[in-house]
Amino acid sequence: MRSAFLIPLLLTASMASSTASAEDFPADRVVAAAAGDWDKDGTPDLALVVRPTDESDVDNGLYIYLHKTNEARLELAASLPNTLWGSMMMSGQEPELVAMANGSLQVITKNETIGRERWRQTLTVAYRNFDFIVAGYTFSGYDTVEMDENGENRTKSCDLNVLTGKGKADDKPVTAKAAFVLLTDWDDAIGQKACGYSR
């Protein structure tokens, strides 16, 4: 959704309270934000990626807020600290959030600059039955050392509908068990296994 919504949403999020496990954090630790209508009630909601403190070695946190209808505030609906890999110190490793027109949220992690394996992963998160689930999993990557039979970097590419268990990996159909996986229960190994990869 339009970035003009982000400033007031960030301000109201800083005052949000919920039964979810809330964590207080200053605005300068917010490294990615997206506004969209996650629950499709016609009001803008918010998602944030928050980096850990400088003294911590844990991963980034993901926090998703829902707008309280008829109230001028956001409520924390999902709190996932130590969830998203990524670094703001190195270009090409920053986590990203993208609000989709259909109300879904894309959560992107990547390593596009360092090491032998370069990759990009996208979780498509949807709001269903009053909770957030992982509806889709997309992964692409390449090996900077290993070559294929054509002398090009060996690549991987997978697009999976988690809800149906159907997708494609390296241009071949793949079928996994259809699953309704809550975002809080998601492990990247679920998608990697379905695609026939390991990382």
What are these regions (language model features)?
Residues 56-79, 125-129:
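Beta-propeller blade repeat segments, especially FG-GAP/WD-type strand-to-loop junctions
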Residues 29-40, 90-104:
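Beta-propeller blade termini
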Residues 40-51, 98-110:
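Acidic/hydrophobic-patterned starts of short beta strands in beta-sheet-rich repeat architectures
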Residues 13-19:
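N-terminal signal peptide c-region/cleavage motif recognized by signal peptidases
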Residues 20-28, 70-92, 178-182:
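Blade-edge motifs of beta-propeller repeat domains
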Residues 102-199:
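Acidic, small-residue rich beta-repeat scaffolds with periodic aromatic anchors
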Residues 45, 59-61, 92-93, 117-122:
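Short, surface-exposed coil-to-beta transition loops
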Residues 1-7:
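Bacterial N-terminal signal peptides that target proteins for export
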